[in-house]
Amino acid sequence: MEEPQAGDAARFSCPPNFTAKPPASESPRFSLEALTGPDTELWLIQAPADFAPECFNGRHVPLSGSQIVKGKLAGKRHRYRVLSSCPQAGEATLLAPSTEAGGGLTCASAPQGTLRILEGPQQSLSGSPLQPIPASPPPQIPPGLRPRFCAFGGNPPVTGPRSALAPNLLTSGKKKKEMQVTEAPVTQEAVNGHGALEVDMALGSPEMDVRKKKKKKNQQLKEPEAAGPVGTEPTVETLEPLGVLFPSTTKKRKKPKGKETFEPEDKTVKQEQINTEPLEDTVLSPTKKRKRQKGTEGMEPEEGVTVESQPQVKVEPLEEAIPLPPTKKRKKEKGQMAMMEPGTEAMEPVEPEMKPLESPGGTMAPQQPEGAKPQAQAALAAPKKKTKKEKQQDATVEPETEVVGPELPDDLEPQAAPTSTKKKKKKKERGHTVTEPIQPLEPELPGEGQPEARATPGSTKKRKKQSQESRMPETVPQEEMPGPPLNSESGEEAPTGRDKKRKQQQQQPV
């Protein structure tokens, strides 16, 4: 028995900082034998330090789960939350004195469970008001600090005495650049010591420079756009006269005006007549006369025309440039319709008269010498309008007395009368003269019929307009028009006009 006691004493020896006391003579409150009774259970209770177990007298405590238990102690109400749980092996052991061991501590059995007592929320009294919670103050930056980071789209808070200057500093980049540009010239002028007027000029100069640069850029952008269509226009203008071979610039302008006055059906016929203009309009210069004579000599074997074909086309550019009123056009159309009717009627009776008309034309054409050709051209360029009108009247009146009576039919006699005031008769005469050089039956007569066209330049502008428009529709029925009566007029009028021209030319050098 001593050995185990000695082992027990050694096992529960007094620690170095404690002193051993003998047990009290009084009986303990509980002993190990009292805890082992059938009506008692051992529970481990955990409670706060100020907990008074008297407040739970007569209260039910849950042995499983959690529950709020109300207690009252010394006139005060207390609320506690009680949590119960099952015991775990080896969690805790109880030492209790035993009478059998002489008052020594012995280990007791394990507890049935654990109870945790926690302080619950205290109930507020009905009369006591709730304490208001103060709102937290907004965050502020200390006065000595300056924020460097600014979020995108946000403005930094402004604090301290520099709040008045902050809006001026937070400006856009454009305003900052303008301020830098304007401040630089002001400082330079302040050093030089100039007046306030120069300062104003310096302030305005950078703005003006910026505006000028913008204007220049806009002009440069506009110039290539404008250069595109403008560059194409002269090319179109130059292409038009290349096909016509015009030597002078004045005729280039007159040509489109003439085209606008006439119908599109007459374009093909006009081009054939205008192509001969550059050879015939160069009458004033002596160098161009030679070129003109060479061009006409090449045409002689085909048509039998030397220089006399030139005055026929000389009138055309002036006629094309002058627009006509609608009333005159109507009269001309009526005259053209009248021209076609007598022309068709004269087809049958005139055909047998072709031979007698050729003899006077053939005899009169070669009478003019070659030396008189350039003189006749120079004489026509110099005299006035009055002399031309007189020549025209004389040239038209005289041939009527010679041959018109026996040879011409009744329909064509009034065409040779120049003194008549009616315009239809004049249209008929000029219409016949245009169709003559195209006829292939008589190569000599087209040259003879051209002096009539030579006499026309002296006529008024109205006659020129009428002759030009009458030529275009009349060229289509050339095959239907009778050859001999037209050639008869040209054969009769040509020799009389040439005789008078020769007399005038012979008198001038004397």
Curated annotation (Swiss-Prot):
Modified residues (N-acetylmethionine): M1
Pfam families: RNA_polI_A34
Compartments, as annotated in UniProt: Nucleus, Nucleolus; Chromosome
One Gene Ontology molecular-function label: RNA binding
Gene3D superfamilies, per database record: 6.20.250.70
Phosphothreonine, modified sites: T287
Crosslinked positions (Glycyl lysine isopeptide (Lys-Gly) (interchain with G-Cter in SUMO1)): K270, K314
Region (Disordered): 1-31, 120-143, 203-510
Location of Phosphoserine modifications: S27, S128, S136, S172, S205, S285, S309, S490
Biased composition (Basic and acidic residues): 258-270
Key words, A-Z: Acetylation, Chromosome, DNA-directed RNA polymerase, Isopeptide bond, Nucleus, Phosphoprotein, Transcription, Ubl conjugation
Biased composition (Basic residues): 421-430
Protein family according to the UniProt entry: Belongs to the eukaryotic RPA34 RNA polymerase subunit family.
Function in brief: Component of RNA polymerase I (Pol I), a DNA-dependent RNA polymerase which synthesizes ribosomal RNA precursors using the four ribonucleoside triphosphates as substrates. Involved in UBTF-activated transcription, presumably at a step following PIC formation.
Assembly: Component of the RNA polymerase I (Pol I) complex consisting of 13 subunits: a ten-subunit catalytic core composed of POLR1A/RPA1, POLR1B/RPA2, POLR1C/RPAC1, POLR1D/RPAC2, POLR1H/RPA12, POLR2E/RPABC1, POLR2F/RPABC2, POLR2H/RPABC3, POLR2K/RPABC4 and POLR2L/RPABC5; a mobile stalk subunit POLR1F/RPA43 protruding from the core and additional subunits homologous to general transcription factors POLR1E/RPA49 and POLR1G/RPA34. Forms a heterodimer with POLR1E/RPA49. Part of Pol I pre-initiation complex (PIC), in which Pol I core assembles with RRN3 and promoter-bound UTBF and SL1/TIF-IB complex.
Protein name: DNA-directed RNA polymerase I subunit RPA34
Gene name of the record: POLR1G
